[in-house]
Amino acid sequence: MEAPPDPRPHASAAAPLRAPEVARLREEQEKVVTNCQEKIQHWKKVDNDYNALQERLSTLPDKLSYNIMVPFGPFAFMPGKLVHTNEVTVLLGDNWFAKCSAKQAVGLVEHRKEHVRKTIDDLKKVMKNFESRVEFTEDLQKMSDAAGDIVDIREEIKTDFEFKAKHRIAHKPHSKPKTSDIFEAEFANDLKSKDLLADKELWDRLEELERQEELLGEIDIDSKPDTVIANGEDVSSEEEKEDQNINVNMMHQVTDSLALSSCYNSLTNSELFNGQVNSPLNYSVNGSSSYHSNEDDGDNNDDGGDSENDHDTLGVEDNSIPTIYFSHTVEPKRVRINTGKNTTLKFSEKKEEAKRKRKNSSGSGHSPQELPMIRTPADIYRVFVDVVNGEYVPRKSILKSRSRENSVCSDTSESSAADFDDRRGVLRSISCEEATCSDASESILEEEQENHQKKLLPLSVTPEAFSGTVIEKEFLSPSLTPHPAMAHPVLPTIPERKEVLSEVSEGTTKRVSKFKAARLQQKN
């Protein structure tokens, strides 16, 4: 009678082939465990020997000498005496010896005992690990020997199948994956041709949209404002105008495509393509600002915020592309200028002039320059300044000039230096006796009125320094009467008013301001 066929031929065939391998694995693991046990026994014996030696060394220095039996060969002993009980020779290794005391030898023994204990612990860990492996191998052998308890699953790989995938390579943005890398597998025979056509149309559509997106992105990046204002000056070049013309031509090419024609149907009838925004806008790119004004504010109010968003990306005009540029306003930096002893000003005249230029250039361009606002005593110092190397420098005091040559109101003619040294001492002594607080305040007001008249001039007219003849306070003596060509102001920035003084002495005379003296000189 024949035996029934085995339903699991692979398992029965694999069991006899696997049994000797499992048995060999078990034997090797048992050898490791046995070797570890032998080493542990050896190191335990060494540890016991070190313990006995440590006890002997601890009691050895108690006596000066000991009677002992000295080994003489492997089987013979002879009586002897142990002397120098506190002197021990220690083997350091490689036949190197060192002499030390018994107490030092005890410390060396303790150090070596720690090394022995560490070695024993490591061997115990290895033995425990392999004991668990031996148990697992025994269980595996039992399962392999028993029929039906274990099933070996094998999967055969056909050699005719080839994996054609490639390594992933970083691709350019806005580019689709290659079809050759995706559709490597063979399609079934029942795949319809309609699906292939749909995929092809989809990829064509995606390519077209990507081209349009790239073109629009390049136009938005390359577009620049018509007028750029940087640091209070208008900056424009022919290259920017040429770039704008090129961008316009590119936009016309985009509008010819099918996708943009469908997108622009809802926007062609609107007023977004007039190149204007609903309200005057001040925008900038990379720190440069530009103005776009809209004269017809009421025509585009119905569009709202949607018109601005569409205007930013899709606005097209025959001659220019309206673009919105945003910027963050920054407060002008106010410079702290130390003018001298007790005066410290917080202003920058150059920043204020640049700010006024930007305001005037953004407007009609013909607005008169605004008058200085004087609300505090510190504002007066902004009007009374000197010109040093083309820059405004505040004075230490409005009653005197820091530099006669660079003063705004000083006279720099050659004849002024001739009589200046002779008349300085006399005029200063007179001014010290006759100057009062009211004179200084009235002179400031008169100076401010003259500055207001200069501010009313157009922007193109540059203010000129005072170059007239001034008659200062002098003695009544006819020898000191100034000649018109030699009468120059000692204090050129001090406007003074005419005052009648009581004739206390012969050295006093009438006091006339330099501006009134100039008018009197012209009348004469």
Swiss-Prot record:
Q: Which GO terms describe its molecular function?
A: chromatin binding; phosphatase inhibitor activity; protein phosphatase inhibitor activity; RNA polymerase II complex binding; transcription corepressor activity
Residue span of region Disordered: 1-20, 284-320, 335-373
Listed Pfam families: Prefoldin
Entry annotated with the keyword Transcription regulation: yes
Q: How is it modified after translation?
A: Phosphorylated. Phosphorylation occurs essentially on serine residues. Phosphorylation occurs in response to androgen treatment in prostate cancer cells in a mTOR-dependent manner. Phosphorylated; hyperhosphorylated in mitochondria in a mTORC-dependent signaling pathway. Phosphorylated at Ser-361 by RPS6KB1 in a growth factor- and rapamycin-dependent manner.
Kindly state a single biological-process term from the GO annotations of this entry.
regulation of cell growth
Q: Which terms are listed as keywords in the entry? A: Cell projection, Cytoplasm, Mitochondrion, Nucleus, Oncogene, Phosphoprotein, Protein phosphatase inhibitor, Repressor, Transcription, Transcription regulation
Superkingdom, taxonomy of origin:
Eukaryota
What does the record note on quaternary structure? Homodimer. Component of the PAQosome complex which is responsible for the biogenesis of several protein complexes and which consists of R2TP complex members RUVBL1, RUVBL2, RPAP3 and PIH1D1, URI complex members PFDN2, PFDN6, PDRG1, UXT and URI1 as well as ASDURF, POLR2E and DNAAF10/WDR92. Interacts with POLR2E/RPB5, RUVBL2 and RUVBL1. Interacts with PFDN2, PFDN4 and STAP1; the interactions are phosphorylation-dependent and occur in a growth-dependent manner in the mitochondrion. Interacts with UXT.
What family, per the record?
A: Belongs to the RNA polymerase II subunit 5-mediating protein family.
Q: PANTHER family under this entry?
A: RNA POLYMERASE II SUBUNIT 5-MEDIATING PROTEIN NNX3, UNCONVENTIONAL PREFOLDIN RPB5 INTERACTOR 1
User: What is the protein's given name?
Assistant: Unconventional prefoldin RPB5 interactor
